[in-house]
Every structure is written in structure tokens, then in C-alpha cells.
């Protein structure tokens, strides 16, 4: 019972609100076309069609009933001469509206174009009964197209706003909250409206022919900032400016054509902007997905490297230790046999060589410093191991990166860039000084390695000496790696910060 009463109140409110809005728009339309029956085909038609495109089918009888009652009342009051044609036309418009009603809740560019097509079809059907009235049929078609494309998209904007926001009942907790007027948006709308009105009223007569082209400026500006909603709001502002300009009084058809063209421009431009935004969002999602997959691949690679390094260290290390032990036993047991003793010493030396080679391989597979040290300490340890001072290279490390903000992939990548950069400096740069800096800037991690050497060898470009692999790792983490060879070599790395 309570639900039925609530539905009844809703229907009654819908009936009276629609009736009041319909009559007001009919009065405005009558001011423009000066014929009561033709005025019904302008803005009242656009209002009814716009609401029917958005609301559930259960409210269609309310809208049609209210319109028919108003048309009947106007027939009695002012003598509408084509009451049957208006009734038949309104029934015919139900067909395209019913066909696309299932898509009304979708908010993509196809929906805008579908509703635009439905508006055009409904306008044709509404004017179809006027086909046998000669010139009036073209006037009816122009009026329905203009009214439908002017008001129906605005209904879509308001319906989208009302349906996509969470509305809470006004209570004590909400009364004390300040109202967000969004002053910047209001000023922006008002400024564009004033400019549009000035273009209609303030341009000299010799430039008046360019006035219709100026109507596109607010549409483009609002569409760029606010998408399809902005484009449709701009068409409403242009319509108000055109009607208020009073320049159409001697040529009402020109006004209708201007309203039709700018409304069609707003609808198509809004659909295009919406399409671009949807493509951009889809591209961003794919980029984020690829970024996530690349990071997962790096994690998997480092996990495999770590496992392989551990297995090599445990198995080969134990085997080499056993070989050295057995070689020592052979040397002691065959102390009198010089050739056997020499072979034992050779085996021990070869095992030490294998151990050193495996140790270097393990260092490339997985930097052992990162297992026990912080990143800064690991880089300092790396610089000591490379014996930069002994090679005549003065080194300086300045590190201002909070390691708690680094993921494991970032730690390994930064260390490997330092490792590869220092290795290239030692082997190829012929440098006397190297500076390594790391810091955080604007939610990004910055790393710079500079030397005063001869730069990269001719012909190597920026791809050799392991730099390609480093660039791929940095790119996989969403960063960039740049190399410049002016007065030495400068390797710059920038990574997006990840909070751990």
C-alpha cells in the first residue's frame, strides 16, 4: 500500500511538472513561430521526446496523456486547427523511442548517436501526417528537428546528472555542511554565455554573416573541458543567446536553421569527444595492464635468477670445495711423486678459477650485496669492489632516496644501472672522475651517473655495453633512460615512485 501511494504521488508530480514545463515551452515557441499548432512541434515536442528517451516506459502514458490534455485544452482555448495530426504524430514517435529504450542507460558515444538517430526518426514521423499540407510539411519537419535536437540532448544531460549521483535525504548532519558552488565552473559558463550573447548583439552588420560560425566556439571550448555534457550545455547557451538577440524577428526560418545546425554540431562534437575519451581510457587501461605484466615479468625473472644463483652457490660451491680437498689429499699422499703432486696443484688452481668464474656469474645473476645491505650500502660496496681509486678514478656518491619507498624491482634495477654504468666507465671511458647521484623529485626516483671521460666509443651509439637491457628494464617499470655524451658521459634514469 505504501509503495502504491508513493508511486501515485510520483505520477501526479510528474504530470503537473511536465504540464507546467510543456506549457511554458509552448509559450516560448509561440513567440517564435506565431502559430499555436506549429508551436506544439517546436520545444514542447523536444521536451516530451527527450523525457521519453530517458525515463522508464511506465511514465510514457503520463507524458502522452498530459500532452494530449494540454493540446485539447489549447484547441478549445485558442483554436488549434490540426489537433488530429498532432495526436497521430505523437503516437508515431513511440516507435523509434521504443526501439532504443534498452540503450538509454548506457553512456558511451554510440548512445549519443543512437539517440540522435532516434530524434531524427521521431521528427520525421511527427511531421509525417503533415505531408499532404504542402509547404507546412517542410515547416513541421524543420520545427520538430529543431525542437528535438535542441531540448532532448539537454534532458539527457540532466538525467545523466541525476542518475549518476548519490542523493541523501536532508538531515541535521547535512545542514551544517558547506555547499560546494564550484565557482570556477560557474564563472566559466557565465563568461562563455556572455561572449556568445555579445557575438549575437555586438558584431557590426558587415560581420553578421559570420555570427553562426561563432556559435561553434563555446561548443568546442566546453566540449574540450567537460566532454559531451559540456558540448550539449553549450548548445543550450547558444540557443538562449540566439533567441534573446532579437535579430531573427524578420527571418524566423534563419533562427530555426541556426538552432538546428548548432544543436547538431553540439551532438556530433559531443559524441566525437566522448569517443576520444573512451579510447583514451581504454588505452590507459591497456597501458596499465601492460605495465603490470612487465613488472610481474621482472619479478619472475629476478625470482628465477635468485633461485638459480642459490642453487649454483650451494651445489657448485660444495663440489669445488670437495675437489680442492681431494686435490690436497692427493698432494699429501703422493709427496714423493712430483708429477702427481704437480697435477694436484693444477687441479686446485683450476678449481679456484672455476670458483672465481662462478662467483662472477652469480654476481651477474643476482647482486649478492642487495641480500644483506641497503641500496646505498650496496652501491658503495660495488664501487669499492671495482677499485675505482686504484684505477685513478675519483668517485663521489650522493644518495638521497628513502629506500622504504622502493619496490624490490626498483632496488634491483637501480643497482644494475649503477653496475653497468660503472662497468662501462672502467672499461671504455678513460675517465678520471665519476659522480653518482640519487634523489626523489615530484613522485619520481632520479639517478644520474656522470664521468669526464671520452664518452661512448664511435659507432656504439646508445645501445651497446648492456645499455639496451638496462633501458628495457627501466621502461618496463614505467621509467626513462637517457644518455648524453657531451663532455663525458651522462646516464640519467627516471622511475615513477611506488609506495610500499
From Swiss-Prot:
Q: Which Pfam family, any one, appears in the UniProt record? A: MASE1
| Classification via SUPFAM superfamilies | ATPase domain of HSP90 chaperone/DNA topoisomerase II/histidine kinase
The biological process GO terms on file are:
signal transduction
Gene3D superfamilies membership: 1.20.5.1930, Histidine kinase-like ATPase, C-terminal domain
Q: Which residues carry this modification: Phosphohistidine?
A: 313
Membrane topology, record value: Multi-pass membrane protein
Mutating residue 313 to E has which effect? Lack of autokinase activity
Q: Which GO terms describe its cellular component?
A: plasma membrane
Q: Which residues cross the membrane?
A: 8-28, 36-56, 80-100, 112-132, 140-160, 185-205, 213-233, 253-273
Query: Any keyword Cell cycle?
Result: no
Q: Where in the cell is it found?
A: Cell inner membrane
The task this protein performs is described as: Part of the UhpABC signaling cascade that controls the expression of the hexose phosphate transporter UhpT. UhpB functions as a membrane-associated protein kinase that autophosphorylates in response to interaction with UhpC, and subsequently transfers its phosphate group to the response regulator UhpA. Can also dephosphorylate UhpA.
Name by which UniProt lists this protein: Signal transduction histidine-protein kinase/phosphatase UhpB
Q: Which organism is it from?
A: Escherichia coli (strain K12)
